[in-house]
Structures are given as structure tokens and as C-alpha cells.
């Protein structure tokens, strides 16, 4: 099949030589060329030894030029031996139809000189944009090569011109620098009016390198190049192309960039690059390993820091198992033993300030005989107005020096000074007679007659002078003093100030059980008056403290009585202070030794516990007296402790 086509082509070529005239040859070639291209595209051009088109380009989209080669035939190297014919078509459809009909007229190249050797130049008058062109090469009527295109497809601008560079910056080490390369667009491209739009590509490298570094495409006519070695020479070149096309122009002239000379040592230091990346990697790995080791070794402590344990309830001296098992009795026992856990009952229980009883005179002896009421309340308290229980800011007890009552109308007897002096003088006068009485005479004589006849001043002193409250600067609780006239003075030695606890109040106080009655020793009449001993004159029975002067007098009396009774007083070392009752008992032991206990006397009834002195001892709250109408100011006196009193008694 292919051989038949070749023979047909040769036959047509031979027959074409029989026609004469110059116009017949192009027409025949025009008819034969499309047929050859349709039959075999490889036959569109002659063999490699024949002339052919190399390129067609339009630098500014206004003109274009086409170039070809001479071939191997020496006859074709002579000028004018090869001709270029072109043909314009109105449109692609019309061009295809005309080419198919073989009726289009071909025109020869208008200029073989302007574009150079073996070229054809088409100026603006022969150039039409967006209109297809077809060109062909012939020699002596023979078709050498053929090509069709449009002008906008063959645009290939000229290279940029006027390359230059400017130093922008130098690094702190002085080893690298930044430059800016600038250029001008091709002079024949109408870039300013926008007829053609160009984009550029810049390439640079060191002189001794073979590979170029590419930057682009760039629309501007300048471009910065960063981090160039200042100790090396660099080459820069630029080329351009129409936007959205693939064909670049030729490269511009190479621009050499030479920096000023720099220190060679600095360049060497720059060449030695420190492996910062590896150091960072190994550093992070080492820190992670250290953290893992620390967390693994201290995991218990870290766990306690993050999640601290819940503290177990714990009381010092108490087993927590007792609280868990609910053994509250044992816990209360432990709390009672330790002083730190003792409750302050005085904060919860209010003290009794005074007790008022409405008792008929006829029933006084019957109801109050042998009871605590005889000691707490008496007719002398109601009649007397010289007893004052004033609270001192420092000690909590009564004081004659309270500034709030300095302007009070004093009693006419001047209880703080006159009464005390009068009593002291009476005691000095009666002391010798009272202590020198014969024990036998005291036993034989009636009590009222002996004391009333021998010492009438004693009864008068007791009736007129009420017991004064004693001062204390070291006690915490405020105690009001009370006078306790009793039918028999010997019963004072047998009164108990401690009793058994029978119940506990909700506020924390203890209720004592009533005590059993005891023998008093001497029958008491309903109309008998109480006769005070020398040691009872200057202090009250209910007072928890005593004055130093009164103590010395009582001790002197007790020593005189030791000669007859041979009874030596003793004081408990556990007590912090000596109570008035103990002194009274010691002073009266000689008088009560020979008296037979015939009468019965009851111990104190009910009261509240002030504090726990020992596991088996309770200190009771004293009963306060009602405040009188007028204030009396007792004189101040010192206090004697247990050790001091024992030394004096020895």
C-alpha cells in the first residue's frame, strides 16, 4: 500500500514538469503538500539532508520572522536557491476548506535580509494577529518544508537588558550578604502600554558550580537574592516569556557579582557548621530519661504530693480504736484524767449569788438545826447591811479599793476601818481570858452561861460585827462570803464540804447526794445564840482563803491549846490554800475533845462542782450572799500558802 502511494506521488511530480510558467509550480506544490501530509505526516518535510524550518518567533507581537537550515546539498547554499512562500487564511474553518479545495494563492517572502541569513522577516504590514499563517520552503519547484501557526503562538520576546546588582545587607559575621538584581525589559516589547505582558526568571550560581539556582517566575524587573557567600564570585542571568506561555526567551548576558574581600578566618569558621540539631535532639532525650528516672524513684512521694492521704482522726492520749468501737465511757475517763481535756464548768453553770428563804422565827431552830442553811443564811445576814461582795477586776473577789464604789455613802460604823479596829481591840482584851479558861469549868458550866458570864463581849462582838469577805488576788472564781451562825460552835468541825455525785446535769454540772447526819455532841436549844471563838471573829466560814494576820492569831491560839489538848494540826500538802474551815477545826479541837457528841448534824445538801482537783476529789462552788443596801469595804490582807503555814505551825 505504501509503495503505491510513493509511486503515485512520483507520477504527479513528473507530470508537473511538463507545464510551463512560474505560477504553475507553486500551485502544483500547494496541491501536493496537503495530500502528502494526510497520507504520511513524516513526509511533510524532506529528508534530513534537505533544508527545513528551525523556528518562527514574534518578539513583540507586532512582527515575526521565520528561520530555516540550508541542508547538505551544496547547490542549495547559494543565495536565492531556496524560496519561502506563505498564505493567510481568514479563519481556521476557511483555511481548512481552501486547503482542501487547492484554490488558495501563495505569496513569496517579503524580506530575506532584515532577519538575517536563511530567514524571512514579516513587518507589521504583513503581520495579522490571531489569523493563521501557512509557510513552505521550495527549491526549483520542489517542496522542502511546510508549517502553519498564528502570531500569538510564536511570541518569544528578546532577553532582558541592563542587568545590575546592589548590596542590601551584610551578616553580623561578615561572611554572607544580600543583593538585589535589577534589569530592563526588552526594548522592542511594548510593556508600558500593556500590549504584551512578560514574566521573568532569574538564575544564579557560584563561578565554580555547574548547577544554576532558579528563582521565578517574577513579574517585576528586580529581585533580591539572599545569603550569598561574600568570599565567592557569583553569576546571575535573566530570561523572559509571555505570560501563560511556555517558551522563554534567550538568557541575558551573565552578570558577575564580586563582594569586597573579607577575613579568611571568619569564612573558615562559617564553613564549620555546628550540629545544633543533633545537640537539641540528644538534649531532649537526656532530659526525658532523667525525668523518667526521677518519677520512677520518687513515685510514692510524688503520689502523696498529688493525692495527699486523708488524715485519720487522732486525739493525743486516746486510742482511735476506742472511738471506732464506741467506748465512750473509757474516752470520758481518759479525758477526765488529763487536765488539758477537763471541761470548764464555770462557763456553763451559773453560780448562785445568794439564797433567800422565807422562814418563820418559830421554825428557825427546827428547820435549820444541823443543816447547811444555818451556815449559808442567818438572821444576821438579813439584818446586817455591812457585808459587801464587790468584785475586783484583778482577783475576782471583793475589795475595798474598787473605784466604782468610792463615792458610796459608807455605814456609820465604817466597816472597813472602824469595825476592824474595834474587833482587833476586843480580841486583844479577851484573848488572854478566853484562852486561860479551865477545861473542867467549861465542861461543868452550861455553854450559854459560861460564855455569856465570863465573856459577854464575845457574844456582843459576834452579833454586832458581821464576818467580812476576804481578799484574794490569785483565785479565778469570785466567791461571795456568807456568815453562818450555828447553834453549837463545835459543829463547825464536823461539816463536810465534799459529797458523792448522784447525777450530771445537761450543762455539765454534778448533783451531789445528801449526806448522812452525824453526831454533834452537844444538845442545842432553839433560843441559843452562836458564840464565836477567837479564830472565828475576823473571817467567814465559807471563805476559801484567810488573811495572814488572822492566820497568825489563830496559830497562836492553836499553839496555846496544844498544851491542854495535845492535838497537833495537820494540813494537806495537795491543797494550794488553807481554808477557813480547817483553821476553825484546828482551833476548836481542844474544846470539842471532851464534849460527847449527842446531837445530830446534817452535812451540806446540794451544790455544784467547781473543778476536779484529783481523780477522787471535787471542789464545790461557794454560795454567794445577797448584796446589802450599803457597801462595806474590808481592809486588804495578805494570803498564806500551805507550805508557809506548815512552817509556821512547826
UniProtKB/Swiss-Prot annotation:
Electron transport recorded as keyword: no
Cystine bridges: 56-66, 109-120, 134-148
A biological process from GO: taurine metabolic process
Region listing for Disordered, in residue ranges: 466-486
Post-translational modification: The soluble form (GHBP) is produced by phorbol ester-promoted proteolytic cleavage at the cell surface (shedding) by ADAM17/TACE. Shedding is inhibited by growth hormone (GH) binding to the receptor probably due to a conformational change in GHR rendering the receptor inaccessible to ADAM17. On GH binding, phosphorylated on tyrosine residues in the cytoplasmic domain by JAK2.
GO cellular component: extracellular region; extracellular space; membrane; nucleus; plasma membrane
Every Fibronectin type-III domain range: 159-262
Domain writeup: The WSXWS motif appears to be necessary for proper protein folding and thereby efficient intracellular transport and cell-surface receptor binding. The box 1 motif is required for JAK interaction and/or activation.
Subunit structure: On growth hormone (GH) binding, forms homodimers and binds JAK2 via a box 1-containing domain.
Protein name: Growth hormone receptor
Phylogenetic lineage: Eukaryota, Metazoa, Chordata, Craniata, Vertebrata
Gene that encodes the chain: Ghr
Amino acid at each position: 500500500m505504501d509503495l503505491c502511494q510513493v509511486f503515485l506521488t512520483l507520477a504527479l511530480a513528473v507530470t508537473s514538469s511538463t507545464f510551463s510558467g512560474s505560477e504553475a509550480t507553486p500551485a502544483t506544490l500547494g496541491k501536493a503538500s496537503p495530500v502528502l501530509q494526510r497520507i504520511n505526516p513524516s513526509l511533510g518535510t524532506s529528508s534530513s539532508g534537505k533544508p527545513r524550518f528551525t523556528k518562527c518567533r514574534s518578539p513583540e507581537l507586532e512582527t515575526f520572522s521565520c528561520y530555516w537550515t540550508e541542508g547538505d546539498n551544496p547547490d542549495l547554499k547559494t543565495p536565492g536557491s531556496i524560496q519561502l512562500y506563505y498564505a493567510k487564511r481568514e479563519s481556521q474553518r476557511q483555511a481548512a476548506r481552501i486547503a482542501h479545495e487547492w484554490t488558495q494563492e501563495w505569496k513569496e517572502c517579503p524580506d530575506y535580509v532584515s532577519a538575517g541569513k536563511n530567514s524571512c522577516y514579516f513587518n507589521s504590514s504583513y503581520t495579522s494577529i490571531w489569523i493563521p499563517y501557512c509557510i513552505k520552503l521550495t527549491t526549483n519547484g520542489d517542496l522542502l518544508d511546510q508549517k502553519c501557526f498564528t502570531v500569538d503562538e510564536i511570541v518569544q520576546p528578546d532577553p532582558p537588558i541592563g542587568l545590575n546588582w546592589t548590596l542590601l545587607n551584610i551578616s553580623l559575621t561578615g561572611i554572607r550578604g544580600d543583593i538585589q538584581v535589577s534589569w530592563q525589559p526588552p526594548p522592542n516589547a511594548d510593556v508600558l502600554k500593556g500590549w504584551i505582558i512578560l514574566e521573568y526568571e532569574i538564575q544564579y550560581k557560584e563561578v565554580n558550580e555547574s548547577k544554576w539556582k532558579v528563582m521565578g517566575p517574577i513579574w517585576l524587573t528586580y529581585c533580591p537574592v539572599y545569603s550569598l557567600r561574600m568570599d565567592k564570585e557569583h553569576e546571575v542571568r535573566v530570561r523572559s516569556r509571555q505570560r501563560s506561555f511556555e517558551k522563554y526567551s534567550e538568557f541575558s548576558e551573565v552578570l558577575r557579582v564580586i563582594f569586597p574581600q573579607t577575613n579568611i578566618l571568619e569564612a573558615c569558621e562559617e564553613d564549620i557548621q555546628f550540629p545544633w540539631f543533633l545537640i537539641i535532639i540528644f538534649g531532649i532525650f537526656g532530659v526525658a530519661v532523667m525525668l523518667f528516672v526521677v518519677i520512677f524513684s520518687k513515685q510514692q512521694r510524688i503520689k502523696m504530693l498529688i493525692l495527699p492521704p486523708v488524715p485519720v482522726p487522732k486525739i493525743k492520749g486516746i486510742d482511735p480504736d476506742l472511738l471506732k468501737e464506741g467506748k465512750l465511757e473509757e474516752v470520758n475517763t481518759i479525758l477526765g484524767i488529763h487536765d488539758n481535756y477537763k471541761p470548764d464548768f464555770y462557763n456553763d453553770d451559773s453560780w448562785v449569788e445568794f439564797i433567800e428563804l422565807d422562814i418563820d422565827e418559830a421554825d428557825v431552830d427546827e428547820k435549820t438545826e444541823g443543816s447547811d442553811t444555818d451556815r449559808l443564811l442567818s438572821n444576821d445576814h438579813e439584818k446586817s447591811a455591812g457585808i459587801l461582795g464587790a468584785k475586783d477586776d484583778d482577783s475576782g473577789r471583793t475589795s475595798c479599793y474598787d473605784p466604782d464604789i468610792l463615792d458610796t455613802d459608807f455605814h456609820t460604823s465604817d466597816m472597813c476601818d472602824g469595825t476592824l479596829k474595834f474587833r482587833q481591840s476586843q480580841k486583844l482584851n479577851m484573848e488572854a481570858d478566853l484562852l486561860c479558861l479551865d477545861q473542867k469549868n467549861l465542861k461543868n458550866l452550861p455553854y450559854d452561861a459560861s460564855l455569856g458570864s465570863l465573856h459577854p463581849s464575845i457574844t456582843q462582838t459576834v452579833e454586832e460585827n458581821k464576818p467580812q469577805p476576804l481578799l484574794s488576788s490569785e483565785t479565778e472564781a469570785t466567791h461571795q462570803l456568807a456568815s453562818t451562825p450555828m447553834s453549837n460552835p463545835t459543829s463547825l468541825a464536823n461539816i463536810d464540804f465534799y459529797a458523792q455525785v448522784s447525777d450530771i446535769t445537761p450543762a455539765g454540772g454534778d448533783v451531789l447526794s445528801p449526806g448522812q447526819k452525824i453526831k454533834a455532841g452537844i444538845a442545842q436549844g432553839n433560843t441559843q445564840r452562836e458564840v464565836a471563838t477567837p479564830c472565828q471573829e475576823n473571817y467567814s466560814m465559807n471563805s476559801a482563803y484567810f488573811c495572814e494576820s488572822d492566820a497568825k492569831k489563830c496559830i497562836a491560839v492553836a499553839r496555846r491549846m496544844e498544851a491542854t489538848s495535845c492535838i497537833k494540826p495537820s494540813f494537806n500538802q495537795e491543797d494550794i490554800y488553807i481554808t477557813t474551815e480547817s483553821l476553825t477545826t484546828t482551833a476548836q479541837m481542844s474544846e470539842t475533845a471532851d464534849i460527847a457528841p449527842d446531837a445530830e448534824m446534817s452535812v451540806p445538801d446540794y451544790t455544784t462542782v467547781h473543778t476536779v482537783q484529783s481523780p477522787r476529789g471535787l471542789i464545790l462552788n461557794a454560795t454567794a450572799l445577797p448584796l446589802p443596801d450599803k457597801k462595806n469595804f474590808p481592809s486588804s490582807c495578805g494570803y498564806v500558802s500551805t507550805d508557809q503555814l506548815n512552817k509556821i505551825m512547826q
